[in-house]
From Swiss-Prot:
This is Nucleoid-associated protein BRADO0764. One of its GO terms (molecular function) is DNA binding. Belongs to the YbaB/EbfC family. It is found in: Cytoplasm, Nucleoid. The keyword Cytoplasm applies. One of its GO terms (cellular component) is cytosol. Homodimer. The keyword tRNA processing does not apply. Gene3D superfamilies: Nucleoid-associated protein YbaB-like domain. It comes from Bradyrhizobium sp. (strain ORS 278).
Length: 106
């Protein structure tokens, strides 16, 4: 019975920590860049895009395809960084609770 109560307490702690982490992820910002800095995408670790910066040299009709490719690349770079920030927070939580890495998280 004590084991069950301990597990319930641990589950409640995990839920509380997860809620805290979700709030924190909204404040963590990462920036993805492409084209040597010609395009930058800033987003939160919750994957909310905050801003997109484009070098004026790319704002020409003949540069449209290049700009599109750079935007996709910068967004992908920012997404990977946001996912890494999320994983880091998750590992900090599961480590403190003595759970194995990746426990219950895709």
């Amino acid at each position: 019975m004590a084991d069950f109560l301990g597990m319930m307490k641990q589950a409640a702690q995990l839920q509380s920590k997860m809620q805290e982490m979700q709030a924190e992820l909204g404040n963590v910002e990462v920036e993805g860049i492409s084209g040597g800095g010609l395009v930058a995408v800033r987003m939160t670790a919750k994957m909310d895009v905050k801003s997109i910066k484009i070098d004026p040299s790319l704002l020409k009709p003949e540069e449209a395809e290049i700009l599109e490719d750079l935007l996709v690349t910068a967004h992908g770079d920012a997404r990977r960084k946001a996912e890494a920030a999320m994983q880091e927070k998750m590992q900090a939580i599961t480590g403190k609770l003595g759970l194995p890495p990746g426990f219950g998280f895709g």
